[in-house]
Amino acid sequence: IIGIDAKFGKLNLAAKYEFKANMNIENDTHDITAPDAAADFMAPYQNGVNTPSDLPAMLSLAASYEILPSLRASVEYHFFDDKNAGMADGKQKTLKHGTHEYLAGVEWDINKLFTVSGGYQKTDYGLSDAFQSDTSFSCDSYSVGFGGRINFTEALSLDVAYFWTTYSDYTKENVRGLGASIDKDVYSRTNKVFGVSVNYKF
């Protein structure tokens, strides 16, 4: 990992690059029960099979600015080089491009007791029909989140946060060659997260 962080008065700039990590996952399968006709479909799950699962190289660029002593804003960009990270059956080659993430956030200290924040993230995976399958798929998305902090003392604080992600459905048309409007696969998901944490500085 290579990183740099520079502060120019109220402006803070940072960059980080993480190199690709080559990984292989080996199955530890104890039992598979399936008809002989399904042997080809079950082959990837047999005991001892190795599947490439690289962690892609990642570039992160960020900037934050102190608008007021109590108000801060930041923007950030991430790029994950998924097209050059090994995946099962080399499916990374079917991606149109690596993953792009765009983020922005604002944090406001209302007073010494309360702090509130909000953020936004948009993710674009560069998906293709060949990349998507019933056992592994992704969906482009955007997320919106809000949070708050209560500072009980200089050492003790409580954080509460909630965010939801809206995913774009991915549709594969005429998957079975039937030429019918119902011949399609739709990949979809939803996500909502609520978090609470207690922080103590020693």
Label for each model-derived stretch:
Residues 1-202:
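Outer-membrane beta-barrel porins/channels
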